[in-house]
From Swiss-Prot:
Organism: Lactiplantibacillus plantarum (strain ATCC BAA-793 / NCIMB 8826 / WCFS1) (Lactobacillus plantarum)
Membership in a protein family: Belongs to the D-isomer specific 2-hydroxyacid dehydrogenase family.
The protein's name: D-lactate dehydrogenase
Top-level EC class as recorded in UniProt: oxidoreductase
Signal sequence bounds: none
Gene name of the encoded protein: ldhD
A Pfam family that the UniProt record links to this protein: 2-Hacid_dh_C
EC number: 1.1.1.28
Length: 332
């Protein structure tokens, strides 16, 4: 049994090493580069591929994998929106993901960043750097006085709800697929418009689908309370970035914490020190005191990386042995 893993980072290698020791019957090849048309031939002779990347898995790459006899593909992440689904179906590829590598990791950072915005931490850091130790005018807000609207109440959304409740915030939620326990608590509102009208903080925990592309746009912002806070630790395409800038300029949005950006693949996880970033929209957001940007690192904890490697590799082994996997993704 042979599995090839692409785009293996240095920080992932210890977890691959652990998995290989636990599964001595599996031969594993680790490739540091992303899966592309140029290196897909490395998969020849392997039974499965374990992959991670934001870059698209194109029809060309998937067809070449299938031509090499590799029909079992395990993603070390949640999202499958960068897969060419028609090719997946046409070639009968088995796909698995890691549906919940660490909900707490993402929920914890979203709340952490919100607290920095509410406590004016970025502004105080600037003042302290200049030895300005005055308080005013940067007075803070308390989370326990606010209503938090959680869009998407899956594993991550529910972890965030628990943390927000711990701070004493009122929490309301919206999800097309409601959680039975949360529904018993009466937490859900019936429409997004209701959530926009009531929430002081809006946090996104939904996947990137056609139906929610730019779900936070000018129309959505217009329905929100003045001075709302926006948290996006899900997918960059959920927010129309230019409309967010306008909402920040008008004061409709008081601040935003973003761990994703719709054109992030050109920027995130790259060392751009001393270089000019020519994305004007990104730089507009990046240079604001009331916008906190992290480079898609909400997931990035030891627990999460361990789970990403072990769950994906276990699923690939299951595919090879049985043709099915616990985390198999079905495409209707």
């Amino acid at each position: 049994m042979k599995i090839i893993a692409y785009a293996v980072r240095d920080d992932e290698r210890p977890f691959f090493d652990t998995w290989m020791k636990e599964n001595p019957d599996v031969e594993v090849k680790l490739v540091p580069e992303l899966l592309t048309e140029d290196n897909v031939d490395l998969a020849k002779g392997f039974d499965g591929a374990d992959v991670y990347q934001q870059k698209d898995y194109t029809a060309e790459v998937l067809n070449k994998l299938a031509d090499e006899g590799v029909k079992n593909i395990s993603l070390r992440n949640v999202g499958v929106d960068n897969l060419d689904v028609p090719t997946v179906k046409a070639r009968g590829l088995n796909i698995s993901n890691v549906p919940a590598y660490s909900p707490n990791a993402i929920a914890e950072l979203s709340v952490t960043q919100l607290m920095q915005l509410l406590r004016q931490t970025p502004l105080f850091n600037k003042k302290l750097a200049k030895q300005d130790f005055r308080w005013a005018p940067d007075i803070a807000k308390e989370l326990n006085t606010m209503t938090v609207g959680v869009i998407g109440t899956g594993r991550i959304g529910r972890a965030a709800i628990d943390i927000f409740k711990g701070f004493g915030a009122k929490v309301i939620g919206y999800d097309v697929y409601r959680n039975a326990e949360l529904e018993k608590e009466g937490m859900y509102v019936d429409t997004l418009d209701e959530l926009y009208a009531q929430a002081d903080v809006i946090t996104l925990h939904v996947p990137a689908l056609k139906d929610n592309y730019h779900m936070l746009n000018a129309d959505a912002f217009s329905k929100m309370k003045d001075g709302a806070y926006i948290l996006n630790f899900a997918r960059g395409t959920l927010i129309d970035s230019e409309d967010l800038i306008k909402a920040l300029d008008s004061g409709k949005v008081a601040g935003a914490a973003l761990d994703t950006y719709e054109y992030e693949t050109k920027i995130f996880n790259k060392d751009l020190e001393g270089q000019t970033i020519d994305d004007k929209v990104f730089m507009n957001l990046f240079n604001r005191d009331n916008v906190l940007i992290t480079p898609h690192t909400a997931f990035y904890t030891e627990t999460a990386v361990h789970n990403m490697v072990h769950v994906s590799m276990n699923s690939n082994k299951q595919f090879i042995e049985t043709g099915k996997a616990d985390t198999q993704v079905k495409f209707d």
